[in-house]
Amino acid sequence: CLVGSEMCIRDRDQAVRRILTVKFELGLFDETYGDPKLVKKVVRNAEKVALAKKVADESAVLLENRNDILPLDLNKYKSVAVVGPNSNQAVLGDYAWTMGDTKEAVSLLQGLQESAGDKIMIRHAEGCDWWSQDKSHIAEAVEVVRNSDIAVVAVGTRSTYLGRSPKYSTAGEGFDLSSLELPGVQEELLKEIKKTGKPMIVVLIAGKPLAMPWV
């Protein structure tokens, strides 16, 4: 918005109003630390969880759809390769992360497995991590793709809570990158998979802008 414009002031007022409303509902203006019993009533109730899912669903943006490959028709394929560092990583945002046993979110791999059931074979390999120059697992991912009818490749960044686990993070508070390109060897992973000639869907899961004009 334009500084000083009526729209800018209205937008700021709305943002502040939302924050203050939640604080009032949590009792933070009556007690410094509020009432812990109110948290699930105000923040983690069914309505708020449903809203969070709706926001996540609507955040997906389709950049390109060559040959109408999307939406993915699982009835057309006998096997799907799900690869990439973000293929089995459920991402909640820059101020939260998930573990392998979480019930708070569903990864791309888990979602496809649940959707496919026993109808098709789902093969998985990460191929590389988010940040390092380790290429030793790319060949494994390429082989998984060769043995499948189509590849779904999830690349991007990884966020953690308040700068924790910096070795494995490439986005979020306190994580700046020197380039807008995909971190690590993810670009090479994509190019090697492309060489297989198999149909390929690229899913970008990122907490910051990335330049990928070649995809």
Predicted feature residues:
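Conserved, charged catalytic cores of large soluble enzymes
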Residues: 17, 21-39
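A short small-residue
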Residues: 5, 34-42, 170
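C-terminal non-catalytic regions of proteins with extracellular/luminal or membrane-system context
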Residues: 5-6, 21, 50-215
